[in-house]
Amino acid sequence: MNIKIGSLLLLLIVSDISFAADDGIAYLQQEIKVKVEVLDEPCDIAPGDELINIDYGTIVDKYLYINTRTIGEKFKINLIDCDISISDRVAISFSGIENSKLPGMLSVIPMSGQGDVGIGIGFETESGEFIPLSDEKQYKLNEGDNSFTFNTFVQAEIDRLIARTIKLGEFESSAIFHLNYD
């Protein structure tokens, strides 16, 4: 799973519109003032955490037919050099292409190009609370280094479980994690 992050940017656009008359003809004059302020991010992402790969290894289809989903695979987002005078909270969310049959979960792409596999990938907190795509989880930051643990899991689509038609083979998916500081 490829996970990336973007930068924080605040853009303020102020537009002043005025009319001026010259020789009896009205002209529209528009002055646009742009102020761009790049904010200091309170934390840096630990080197190597910009791209997180998760390998599920071999998943036996019979396991999914019995349990509907796999046990969560842990991964961490490590933030370093946090300055809580800038912000003491972070909201973490995940985005990607959603599986239409498993709301809030990522769709997967079969490596063989066989079409729909019948599974999705979900995110959850370390304690097992489901995190739908685009939903933010709020966390308090500590001065210095912070580590946030999450799980991803593979879940079968209900109709594929009933029909026992999960396609076998390798698959991939990607998501982006977002950090929003308060």
Regions found by a protein language model. Name each.
Residues 2-3, 19-182:
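Mature extracellular/passenger domains of Gram-negative fimbrial/pilin and adhesin proteins
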Residues 2-10:
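Sec-dependent signal peptide recognition
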Residues 11-19:
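Hydrophobic h-region of N-terminal signal peptides that target proteins for export
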